[in-house]
Each structure stands twice: as structure tokens, then as C-alpha cells.
């Protein structure tokens, strides 16, 4: 809900350099990426009334929405998941906030948490 509060809470646990918070006015979203020991954590704030994160936050509060796995071949990996019967929100890869191809599984694929596939 509040990207600054989330980053501040994390900084109480681990040393963080002030990450850049990027604004995407056309999507009514903010995004910050924190990299630690080879892991990237992406924090999102949805300031719309009907965006997917706004709906998620109303339903579940502040919680992990998804985690991301990197893919060197998005089309192949999306097709493989679909062939295994994994429900997908994105039947084909699309361009995400960072300008990379992404695709999400449906939340019910992993007990309420989506998996995002993304180009590196």
C-alpha cells in the first residue's frame, strides 16, 4: 500500500541503500527494486482504485503478491506451464514495468501466490 513504509520496515532489518522509487503515472503505480546478495525484491504501490494490486490489498492486506523466476525463453516456458495445466493470467508474454517480457500464473496455481516469469 505504501512503498516508503515498506522500504523503511525492511531497512530496520537489513542495511539498505536508498533505492530509487520510479513512478508510472499512466498506471498509477510506483516501483522500487532492492537488490541483496543476488536476490532482487520489487516493491510496488498501486494508487488506483481498480488496479490488480489495489484489489489484492483490499482482499488480503499487505502481503506477498508474487515471486519472480527468470526465464531465458519466455514463450517456451509459458507454453510448458500451460501444457502442464498450470493456469496462466497471461497466455502470451507481455511487456512489464521494467520493459522486460513477463507472464503471470493465476494465483490459484500456488495457493494464492502468483509466479511471475520475466526476462533477465
PLM segments and residue spans:
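Conserved active-site tyrosine of GNAT-family acetyltransferases
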Residues: 6-11, 81
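A cross-kingdom feature marking solvent-exposed beta-strand/loop segments within repeated
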Residues: 11-29, 47-65, 84-102
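A short secondary-structure junction signal
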Residues: 8-9, 45, 116
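Short, charged/polar surface micro-motifs in flexible loops or helix N-caps
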Residues: 37-41, 48-50, 74
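Short, composition-biased local secondary-structure segments
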Residues: 1-5, 45-50
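N-terminal beta-strand motif that seeds the catalytic metal site of vicinal oxygen chelate
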Residues: 1-8, 62-71
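Vicinal oxygen chelate
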Residues: 22, 32-35, 41-42, 69, ...
Amino acid at each position: 500500500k505504501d512503498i516508503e513504509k515498506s522500504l523503511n520496515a525492511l531497512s530496520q532489518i537489513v542495511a539498505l541503500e536508498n533505492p530509487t522509487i520510479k513512478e508510472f503515472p499512466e498506471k498509477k503505480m510506483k516501483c522500487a527494486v532492492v537488490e541483496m546478495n543476488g536476490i532482487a525484491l520489487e516493491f510496488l504501490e498501486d494508487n488506483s482504485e481498480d488496479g490488480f494490486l489495489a484489489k489484492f490489498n483490499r482482499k488480503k492486506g499487505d502481503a506477498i503478491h508474487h515471486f519472480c523466476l527468470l526465464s531465458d525463453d519466455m514463450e517456451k516456458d509459458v507454453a510448458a506451464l500451460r501444457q502442464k495445466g498450470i493456469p496462466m493470467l497471461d497466455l502470451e508474454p507481455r511487456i512489464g514495468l521494467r520493459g522486460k517480457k513477463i507472464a503471470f500464473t493465476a494465483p490459484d496455481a500456488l495457493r494464492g501466490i502468483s509466479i511471475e516469469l520475466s526476462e533477465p
